[in-house]
Amino acid sequence: MKTVSQLIDMKQKQTKISMVTAYDFPSAKQVEAAGIDMILVGDSLGMTVLGYESIVQVTLADMIHHGRAVRRGAPNTFVVVDMPIGAVGISMTQDLNHALKLYQETNANAIKAEGAHITPFIEKATAIGIPVVAHLGLTPQSVGVMGYKLQGATKEAAEQLILDAKNVEQAGAVALVLEAIPNDLAEEISKHLTIPVIGIGAGKGTDGQVLVYHDMLNYGVEHKAKFVKQFADFSVGVDGLKQYDQEVKSGAFPSEEYTYKKKIMNEVNNND
C-alpha cells in the first residue's frame, strides 16, 4: 500500500500517480489488480451507482457504506473517501466528528473535502491525525452556484487558485485534486506545491490523474465530460444480457453443461 510519504516521493521523482474513482467491492478489486496507485470513493456515487439526480442526496452513511466496500476490495491500495455535502461547514466540532467517523469506519488512508474555505478544518483534522486531501477548481458540491464550467479562466481567478492551493498545503493537506482548470495553471500550481497534485480535466502537467471507473470503462454512463477518455467498453454487457434473455425464452439455457448431473427423483419415488 502506498503511503503519503511514498506519494510525495513519486512527485519528487516525477513518477506520475494514477487514481481511479470507484464505489464498490468488485470495481475496487479490479482497480487494485491493475496496480492503480490510489482509489477515490467519490460522492459522485450518488448519481453513478445510486441513481440520484445529484450528489446533494448523498449522506455520510452512504459514504461509509461504500468506503467500507472499497476497502474490502482493495486492502492494499491508498483509499481516499469523500466528505459528502453538509458534512463540513456546520461547526468545527461536528465537522471533526463527521471526519473522524468517516475515517475510522471506512479504514481509509485519507478523507477528501472540497473548497478553499475549509482551510481551518484541514488544520484541525490534521492536528488530530486525520489526513485530508483538498479539492479545488470545479468542486462538484458547488456546481449549483458555479455550474459545470472551466474554473480559473481569468487572471484574477487563476491568481486566487494559486493562493488557495498554497493555503491548503500550508494547512496540512496531504494531496490536492484540481478539477477543470487550464492546463498551464494546473502545471504552475503543481510546481509550487510539495504535496502531490492530482488532476481531472486539468491537463498533463499535474503529478497524477484521476478518472471515474464507470466513465473510463463506459459502464452505465450516458454523458461523459470532455476530459474523459474511454479505455474499455463495458456497455457490451447489454449484448450478453440480451442473449441470456433469448436463451431463457427459447429453452437453450441452461443446457446440460450448466446442469448438475445428480438424479434424485428415483430415490424419492422409491420411498413412496
UniProtKB/Swiss-Prot annotation:
What EC number(s) is this enzyme filed under?
2.1.2.11
Q: Which residues form the active site?
A: 179
Cofactor note, please?
Answer: Binds 1 Mg(2+) ion per subunit.
Task: Give the cofactors, semicolon-separated.
Answer: Mg(2+)
The gene from which this protein is expressed is: panB
Which family, according to UniProt? Belongs to the PanB family.
Q: Which residues constitute the signal peptide according to the record? A: none
**Single Gene Ontology MF annotation:** 3-methyl-2-oxobutanoate hydroxymethyltransferase activity
Per its record, the protein catalyses: 3-methyl-2-oxobutanoate + (6R)-5,10-methylene-5,6,7,8-tetrahydrofolate + H2O = 2-dehydropantoate + (6S)-5,6,7,8-tetrahydrofolate
Species in which this protein is naturally found = Staphylococcus aureus (strain Newman)
- Any idea where this protein resides? Cytoplasm
Purpose: Catalyzes the reversible reaction in which hydroxymethyl group from 5,10-methylenetetrahydrofolate is transferred onto alpha-ketoisovalerate to form ketopantoate.
Full protein name: 3-methyl-2-oxobutanoate hydroxymethyltransferase
Keyword DNA-binding applies: no
- What is a single cellular component term in the Gene Ontology annotation? cytoplasm
**Where does this protein hold 3-methyl-2-oxobutanoate?**
43-44, 82, 112
List, in alphabetical order, the GO biological process terms annotated in this UniProt record. Answer: pantothenate biosynthetic process
Q: Does the keyword Transcription apply?
A: no
